[in-house]
Structures are given as structure tokens and as C-alpha cells.
Amino acid sequence: MIDTNPITNNHTFALTCSFFDDTHETELSTIIGENNILAFKRGNSILTTRWNLDELVLWLRDFIDTMAEDPYPVEADGEYAAIKDINARDFDSDDEDKFDAYYDRLDDWNLRHRWHPASCGAVLADLYFQLVGNEVEISWNNEDAEEGVEFLNIVGGVKVKKENFYNVVDAFLKAYALHWFN
């Protein structure tokens, strides 16, 4: 294991990571304000994500390199994407084509803005990332955590300046690549 790498630009958003060479695992914390939004309780222990994060890193690299305004695909109540996604999932229709088209739009958008599909089995908070103007909205919905896992931050969101978000994530991705891919 090497020392923990704090990657931050301000007190709003930071990442910290530690690498475990013997298992090719990375321990990752995503700090919003003073809270690690990846933190979860399992049994009597408070933990954070620790896994092989190669797929997640590739997803994050693609997201920050192609970041563009891409509004949530349907009209739904909520300030942040995670909350909109909760509310948008109530849609129903007797028209099967309309029903399928609606949920296909949601699923396509989620693949571009939600990192959970790239988790590869990690216990990972369900985060959404959306560029809106000069800010990246980071939001989360951890209502449906796996059995035995209780996230400390269930639903919420924050806005981070695009430049700060990019710089922090890019620095993490470079540190990860330097450690694992060289």
C-alpha cells in the first residue's frame, strides 16, 4: 500500500485514494464538504469503496473528456439528477411502445451520467454527474443499497465549479493510471 493521496481544489469537493498492490484494489473516498459520500456501514464498521476500479476510472475519463450539457431526458421534479431519476421512475403507460421508449431514454441518459454501471461489483454509492452551465452537479441516490450495506448519505446533491471538478477528477485519474497502468 502507498500513502493516501488527497486530491482537492477546495473544501467543496475532493477525492482521496489509497492503492493496495497485493490485491490491485483502490480505496476511494469522494468528499463533499466534510462528508465522504461513498461511506457505508456494514455490520459495526464504517467503510468506503475498496475494489479494482479500472472500469470506473475508464468511465470517469470518458465523462470528463466528453462533458457537455445534456439535460435530464424527461420532465421530472427535483433539483438534481438523482432526485429527478427517483421521481421519473413512476411513469406508466398501457402503450408498450411509449413505455419502452420512455425508459430507454432514461436508461441511455443514465449510462452517460451515472457511474454505478461501471462499478464491476464494488460497493459503490450511486452517483450521478451532470454538467449544467459552468457547474457539475454531483448527486446521489443510495436508497437501494445491497443487503447488509447502509450508506451514510442516502440522497443529496451539490454543485461544483466545472474547472474544479475537472481538475480534481483528472488528477485522480492520472494518479490511478500512473500507479496501475504503467
Model-flagged regions — what are they?
Residues 1-182:
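Preference for intrinsically disordered or flexible, low-complexity segments
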